[in-house]
Swiss-Prot record:
GO molecular function (one): NAD+ nucleosidase activity, cyclic ADP-ribose generating
Enzyme Commission number, as recorded: 3.2.2.6
Skewed-composition ranges (Polar residues): 997-1010, 1046-1073
Gene this protein is translated from: Sarm
Family affiliation: Belongs to the SARM1 family.
Compositional bias of kind Low complexity: 34-48, 1321-1335
Extent of Gly residues compositional bias: 1012-1026, 1125-1135
Name the UniProt record assigns to this protein: NAD(+) hydrolase sarm1
InterPro entries: ARM-like (IPR011989), ARM-type_fold (IPR016024), SAM (IPR001660), SAM/pointed_sf (IPR013761), SARM1 (IPR039184), TIR_dom (IPR000157), Toll_tir_struct_dom_sf (IPR035897)
Organism annotation: Drosophila melanogaster
Entry function: NAD(+) hydrolase, which plays a key role in axonal degeneration following injury by regulating NAD(+) metabolism. Acts as a negative regulator of MYD88- and TRIF-dependent toll-like receptor signaling pathway by promoting Wallerian degeneration, an injury-induced form of programmed subcellular death which involves degeneration of an axon distal to the injury site.
Gene Ontology biological-process annotations: antiviral innate immune response; defense response to virus; NAD catabolic process; negative regulation of MyD88-independent toll-like receptor signaling pathway; positive regulation of receptor signaling pathway via STAT; response to axon injury; signal transduction
Disrupted gene: phenotype observed: Severed axons in wild-type flies disappear completely within a week of injury, whereas axons of neurons homozygous for any one of the three loss-of-function alleles: l(3)896, l(3)4621, and l(3)4705 persist for several weeks after severing. After infection with Gram-negative bacteria, the respiratory epithelium displays an over-active immune response with a greater increase in expression of Drs compared to wild-type larvae.
Active-site residues, Swiss-Prot/TrEMBL: E919
Length: 1360
């Protein structure tokens, strides 16, 4: 019963307070006459307490109450009195008169929605609510008394005087009111006053009127120790004068607002805003002519001050920044700028005072850290940049305020403090605007670059983002600054971060390289080339993220515009990615895709991009036009299109818009329309279809205005323009000046290159010529007019090209004919397996998620000297390019990138429709060295579910890719590529399918520069069977192998010694002529599988490389036929032996030099006899008495003995025997004539027959007829190193006891004969140490050793 009554009484109180709340919304209404009222009321609620429960009516400041303005309408005395009575009655009902000791409790929250008294009345200002939430206000005292007071007063007066010709009237009105509410230690007070005055005067037809009004408001809220005050003063006045022919009026209004927050210690914050406006109008008429005029003046000022730091930065809400939109007014933007600029100034001042030790409110006093305040400033600036449309203005203004207040200097000082380093770097990354960059460069560039490099070395991704972001901004200052940043390690830090997988970091890297390309100048662009920047741009341009891809393409487009480095840039392959990007993206949509370019670039940045619009490279112009189109849309929204006129970009855009380049002209025309400029006449790319007017427009664009009439008179259209020759231009057009004639021909050649001949070119002649080179596209129209098509192309000869097609350049004719032959040979044939392996690595990957890893592998391998092919063009559905298959056939190594689900589409793909499936099968069929790169997230599918033709790929040794340890992974991959592996593991590999071909990695030490294979035994074989080669070319093949190996050693050392790309290509031209159908991308230095430790110098007879040791002329490699390769395939045992190298013949331990020379002569004779017999019989079986101990023993590099390998293990290591370096004349002297020869074979005697002299290699320093040079001092022998595989040491070197001479002779015969058959095995797994050890033992003195040996051998033979 009592509970119900209490609940009812509380409900009545709530209703009463709700009525007060509604009444507060009504405005004051006045009555006639003079009214003066005063009222006061007090409400007291006694409290009843006991030892168990206390009834405390404690209003909470955090409840939702109406604001201060809602209490201004309490004016009607009767309603207020009535409500007061209701409240008093409600409180009286709470006390039980029968039992004064009753315990009164509040109902539970579940029973009554009214949690406390006064829930319907807001006792706080909104700002007070924020202070309450932060713990600054709020008293926990119990409210036992609520006091409400109200006072109001109104006065009015009016006076009027009227006489003849005169009238005067005056009226005044004053009002004042005050309201106050007290509840415990909460005191809210509101006061308001208003005054109005009006005067009217009329004399002899002239009327004047004056009005004035003043309103003053004041609010005050005290909660605990916090006091908030606010005031608002408004004054307005107007005056009017009017007569028959004249009238004038003037109006003025001013407003002043002020608010402050105070504590017992003083003022925390204070804000003041003052604004005023005035307007004057007049009109006058005289004799029917009237004139009017008006003027308006407005002014506004705002002041904000803070005494010390905000005690709770977490409560500093950024709602006004969040609420700003693209439609926000300018006044709102200015107020926000002023507010936060003052806040930044105050915080920076407090931090500076704290650093000096003189701050009254320090960070330690409030229990915070300095980094928190820096992070708060960072948040403010970050949100300012994010505001749509106005973010550029907001961000720039706040960054300027930070610099002007000394905050930028403070941040640079903090760069050397470990505890504040990162938070300062974060803020620096956000505020490096143009002016701030200049300040940093002038006052502390080294500190900022150092902290940026430190951040990039941190494993935390957030640190890397900040570091690369700072470097991105610093590269946008000047050429000198770019040089300094590069010198301090900024560019190296950016390039290292290109390896990461974090999107934000890669975006900073791409933008940083684009900025460096624009601002760096020619000198810094050379530095970029030396650091292989174009190669590192490839994985960025190949990325899936559009922002990363775009700025990487932009960087490469700027670099390629520099003619000095254009050739190096083209090698990276990035330029091929530009056109697909610009054709698949819309400039306006791309501008909105990322905040990084949502506000556009600065004027200086765009000015440096203007020259790219005039680049000769079509890709560079396409991307530059795309960017200006994007910038035009952004600047139009900002109302800043005049910037394009200031940087002189209008004329450049007009030139591009009228050029025949379809892509660039489209974007340039769109940019001009957005700017508001007229679009010039558009020329189609279909030049053969041009009209006479189009030709005249083109002539005008290239600057030959004086000859436009001549072209008009001759009615030259597009067809005739492409047929013009030098005689026509001189005689018919009248270009007599030779230099002008050259200029016109140059422009005409450029036009022919970019022209579109699709209307007439059904045979794809333009595409065929462009693959040879861009200069060859100029012959397209002439060859089409000559009637050359697919059928006639194979029958074209040199006379036809010169006479019918007008190709007077003999070198161009030769290259075209070679391209025709290569086009015929590119079709699959029976000899396709013998195609020259001119490509080092083919990278296969899944486009959906493997492009980044694949492109990263490409860069790493190219930096280590490998030529790499990666497909960047997306193939059409149902089409598999034959050129891609040919690239796989020409590749020595096939790197398979296995990212998550990379083989998912291959499952049950029996028809071989998947591209990755096709590439794997092509690599298996081509006997490529297949190396899987396995991502950590990749899981192998069940082998049984894979198609049978690719199952064996699951059993290959691979490299587990760990992104954080890239260098180690690449080192292991390089060892695989160069032929070092764990033989035992590979030999024990189980084929994927029983009975199928065993696809195992084939690692030989063939020179990478031999085109047709050094040895003839490179034919196809299946299973474990061996095979012989064409014996007629054995010695020639050995010579080529020795020559190529020496070239490899020499070039590999040059690559390691010199960073210059130009020097790295120094000696490739002589050998590249023997390659077949070279690819455009195969211009990078080819790596070498044989890696020597001894440095081979380029000059000097005593330090000649292996190719200089050749006594005969250089012989081009011979290509063996398929029949020759299959000969002797049934005798696989003969290929299981090694032949001694010259080191083994010269380095017998425990003997004198004379004894070693005598032994060498005996071995030469025995080996030559065995080789002759082997050539006749085509097979040689190993001796049966070989023990198991001999089978398991390993062979050392120096002491080579007669040890037979296991019969079931194929040996596939090419060893440099004495035959590699013996001349044919010397062999003829050593071997006696033999007449018993088998058909189809050649002995050493046959090989000694003098041959037709071959052209001498230019770098050969001696021949067989040259005198023997003097013997220089022999260097110390290097310690023999153990051969290691990626998994560790794969073979051990052990010392052996000397064998009897008879056994040694027999072993020599076996190994000598094995050299005939060793090249035929396709599945051999083991490699020999003799070829690797030969150059180590030589120690740069190989030629001297050879000459010494030959001299001693000849002297021994001639002795009786």
């Amino acid at each position: 019963m009592k509970a119900a009554e209490i609940k009812r009484d509380l409900t009545n109180i709530q209703k009463s307070m709700s009525e007060i709340n509604d009444l507060a919304k009504e405005r004051i209404t006045g009555g006639p006459g003079s009214i003066s009222t005063t009222s006061a009321s007090a409400i007291t609620a006694p409290s009843t307490m006991s030892q168990t429960t206390t009834s405390r009516l404690a209003p909470k400041l955090t409840s939702a109450h109406p604001s201060i303005d809602d209490l201004r309408g309490l004016s009607r005395q009767d309603k207020i009195t009535q409500l007061q009575k209701k409240i008093r009655a409600s409180f009286e009902n709470l006390v039980d008169h029968d039992d004064s000791n009753v315990i009164v409790t509040l109902p539970d929250d579940d029973d009554c929605p009214h949690n406390h008294f006064g829930s319907g009345l807001n006792l706080t200002h909104p700002t007070a609510a924020q202070l309450s939430a932060s713990g600054l206000s709020g008293s926990s005292k119990t409210i036992d008394t609520i006091k409400f007071q109200e006072k109001s007063m109104k006065t009015e007066s009016k006076t009027k005087v009227v006489t003849d010709g005169f009238s005067s009237e005056q009226a005044t009105s004053n009002s004042a009111e005050m309201k106050r509410l007290q509840a415990g230690d909460i005191d809210y007070q509101e006061s308001k006053g208003a005054s109005a005055m009006r005067n009217r005067l009329e004399v002899d037809g002239v009327k004047t009127e004056e009005n004035a009004a003043v309103i003053k408001e004041a609010l005050s809220l005290r909660t605990g120790d916090i006091t908030q005050q606010a005031s608002n003063n408004v004054a307005a006045s107007s005056i009017t004068v009017q007569s028959e022919n004249f009238s004038a009026d003037k109006k003025a209004i001013s407003q002043s607002q002020q608010s402050q927050t105070m504590t017992s210690n003083g003022i925390i914050s204070q804000e003041k805003h003052v604004s005023s406006a005035s307007q004057a109008n007049y009109s006058m008429s005289h004799k029917g002519v009237s004139s009017t005029g008006s003027s308006m003046i407005t002014s506004s000022s705002q002041m904000s001050a803070m005494n010390g730091q905000m005690l709770k930065l977490a409560d500093l809400k950024l709602d006004d920044l969040k609420s700003l939109t693209a439609g926000s007014g300018q006044q709102e933007i200015e107020q926000t700028i002023n507010k936060y600029s003052n806040m930044l100034t105050s915080i920076v001042s407090s931090l500076q005072e704290d650093e000096r030790g003189g701050s009254a409110i320090t960070v330690h006093d409030v229990g915070g850290k300095k980094s928190q305040y820096l992070e708060k400033i960072n948040e403010v600036i970050r949100r300012a940049w994010a505001v749509p449309t106005h973010g550029h203005e907001l961000g720039y203004s706040l960054c300027n305020s930070l610099r002007q207040s000394g905050g930028l200097d403070l941040l640079m000082k903090n760069c050397v403090k470990p505890d504040l380093q990162f938070s300062s770097a974060q803020l620096l990354e956000q505020c490096l605007t143009t002016e701030n960059r200049k300040h940093v460069v002038d006052n502390g560039l080294d500190k900022v670059v150092n902290v940026a490099c430190v951040c990039t070395k941190n494993s935390n991704m957030e640190h890397s983002r900040v570091g690369t972001g700072i470097l991105e901004h610093l590269f946008k200052h000047s050429e000198g600054t770019c040089s300094d940043v590069i010198r301090l390690g900024g560019l190296d830090a950016v390039l290292f971060e290109c390896r990461t997988s974090d999107l934000e970091t890669l975006r900073h890297c791409a933008s940083a390289l684009a900025n460096l390309s624009l601002y760096g100048g020619a000198e810094n662009q050379e530095e970029m080339i030396l650091r292989k920047v174009p190669m590192w741009l490839f994985p960025l341009a190949f990325h899936n993220d559009d922002n990363i891809k775009y700025y990487a393409c932009l960087a490469i487009a700027v670099l390629v515009a520099n003619k000095e480095i254009e050739a190096e840039v083209l090698k990276s392959g990035c330029l091929d990615l530009v056109e697909p990007f610009v054709t698949s993206h819309d400039p306006s949509a791309f501008a909105r895709s990322n905040l990084a370019h949502a506000h556009g670039q600065s004027k200086h940045w765009l000015k440096r991009l203007v020259p790219v619009l005039s680049s000769n490279r079509e890709e560079a112009r396409n991307l530059a036009a795309f960017h200006f189109c994007m910038e035009a849309g952004i600047k139009r929204e900002q109302g800043n299109t005049d910037i394009f006129r200031e940087i002189n970009a209008i004329e450049a855009l007009k030139n591009v818009a009228s050029c025949p380049n379809a892509i660039a002209s489209k974007f340039a025309a769109q940019a001009l329309r957005l700017i508001g400029e007229t679009v010039p006449h558009k020329l189609s790319q279909q030049v053969p279809l041009w009209s006479v007017e189009d030709v005249q427009e083109w002539v005008k664009q290239i600057g030959f205005n004086d000859y436009i009439d001549k072209f008009n008179e001759s009615q030259v259209d597009g067809d005739l323009l492409l047929k013009l020759n030098q005689d026509n231009l001189r005689a018919d057009i009248g270009i007599g000046n030779g230099i002008l004639l050259k200029r016109f021909e140059r422009e005409l050649q450029n036009l022919k290159r970019m022209a579109d001949y699709s209307s007439k070119d059904t045979a794809k002649m333009h595409q065929f010529l462009s693959e040879i080179g861009t200069d060859y596209c100029t012959y397209t129209y002439a060859m089409l007019n000559a009637g050359i098509d697919k059928c006639a192309l194979p029958h074209v000869n040199e006379d036809m090209l010169m006479t019918e097609c007008g190709i007077h350049n003999s070198i161009h004719r030769l290259r075209i004919l070679n391209a025709v032959k290569n086009l015929e040979n590119s079709l699959p044939s029976s000899s396709e397996e013998n195609m020259a392996k001119t490509l080092d690595v083919f990278v296969s990957y899944r486009r959906s998620n493997g492009s980044q890893l694949a492109s990263l592998l490409k860069v790493h391998l190219q930096l280590r000297g490998f030529s790499v092919f990666i497909d960047v063009e997306r193939l059409e559905a149902g089409k598999f390019d034959n050129g891609l298959l040919n690239s796989i056939r020409q590749a020595k190594n096939f790197v398979l990138v296995l990212t998550p689900d990379a083989l998912h589409r291959c499952i049950n793909d029996e028809d071989c429709k998947d591209w990755v499936h096709r590439e794997i099968v092509a690599a298996l069929n081509s006997n490529c060295n297949i190396i899987p790169i396995i991502d950590q997230q990749f899981d192998w599918p069940e082998v049984e579910r894979l198609p049978e033709d690719m199952r064996s790929v699951a059993h290959f040794n691979g490299v587990n890719w760990i992104h954080d340890y890239q260098d180690a992974c690449i080192d292991k991959l390089e060892r695989f590529l160069r032929g070092e592996k764990n033989i035992d593991r590979i030999a024990a590999m189980v084929p994927g399918t029983p009975g199928s071909v065993s696809y195992q990695r084939m690692h030989s030490n063939d020179s990478d520069y031999q085109s047709g294979g050094a040895g003839a035994g490179s034919g196809a074989g299946t299973g474990g069977g061996g095979g012989g080669g064409v014996t007629g070319s054995v010695v020639d093949g050995l010579m080529v192998a020795a020559n190529g190996s020496g070239q490899a050693n020499h070039q590999a050392n040059r690559y390691r010694q010199s960073p210059s790309p130009a020097r790295q290509r120094g000696s490739t031209s002589q050998l590249s002529g023997y390659s077949r159908a070279p690819s455009k991308r195969s211009q990078i230095l080819t790596p070498y599988r044989t890696q020597q430790a001894a440095l081979l110098h380029k000059t000097g007879a005593g330090s000649a490389s292996m190719q200089n040791m050749m006594p005969l002329a250089y012989l081009p490699p011979r290509r063996s036929s398929a029949a020759g390769l299959g000969h002797g395939s049934g005798s696989g045992m003969g290929s299981g032996y090694r032949s001694h190298s010259v080191d083994g013949l010269l380095d017998q331990a425990g003997s004198t030099p004379e004894q070693r020379i005598a032994a060498a002569a005996a071995k030469v004779t025995a080996g030559s006899t065995a080789l002759t017999n082997a050539s006749s019989t085509s097979t040689l079986q190993p001796e049966e008495e070989v023990t198991d101990a001999a089978l398991n023993d390993s062979v050392t590099r120096r002491d080579k003995h007669t040890l037979s390998p296991p019969g079931n293990v194929q040996q596939h290591r090419k060893s440099r025997s004495l035959d590699h370096i013996l001349s044919k004349q010397t062999l003829a002297e050593l071997l006696p004539p033999s007449s018993e020869l088998a058909d189809g074979t050649q002995s050493m005697q046959n090989l000694a027959i003098p041959m037709t002299p071959q052209p001498q290699r230019r770098d050969t320093s001696s021949s067989s007829k040259s005198p023997t040079p003097e013997r220089p001092p022999q260097p110390a022998m290097e310690r023999v190193r153990e051969r290691q595989s990626p998994e560790g040491v794969s073979a051990t070197e052990s010392e052996r006891e000397d064998q009897p001479e008879e056994c040694l002779r027999h072993g020599n015969q076996q190994r000598a004969s094995a050299s005939v058959h060793r090249g035929a095995s396709l599945t051999s797994n083991k490699t020999s140490n003799s070829s690797l050890g030969s150059n180590f033992s030589a120690g740069g003195n190989n030629k001297t050793i050879f000459n010494r040996t030959m001299k001693k051998v000849r002297s021994l033979i001639k002795k009786p």
